[in-house]
Amino acid sequence: MTMKRLLLVSTLAGASALATLPANAFWGWNPFGWGGGPWDGPWGGGPWGSPWYGGYPYHGGYYPYGLYGVPYGWGAPVYGYPGYVYPGYAYPAPTQPSTKSQ
């Protein structure tokens, strides 16, 4: 029984570790923060330093996922990932006057 549990634990740990490799290769970050992303270097590192997320040449304000890019507001790659982005919300509604105008 102990050997089966050890095999199961090691399989799950290995699968979890290998599952982060595509994320690191594509986005330049992974849940464990291993290694450097493809945008490390002159753009400032990580997905936020890449051309699409605030680095040269776009500086975060242009298509496709710039500063206010929807749904990736502020250039965070994973919508809703805690600690990196704000919770999802629609475009801000115009402010309403506090008193009724006649």
From Swiss-Prot:
Keywords: Signal. It comes from the Bacteria. Residues 1-25 form the signal peptide. To T.roseopersicina TR2. Structural protein of the sulfur globules, which are intracellular globules that serve for sulfur storage in purple sulfur bacteria. The protein envelope of the sulfur globules is composed of the three different proteins CV1, CV2 and CV3. This is Sulfur globule protein CV3. The lineage of its organism: Bacteria, Pseudomonadati, Pseudomonadota, Gammaproteobacteria, Chromatiales.
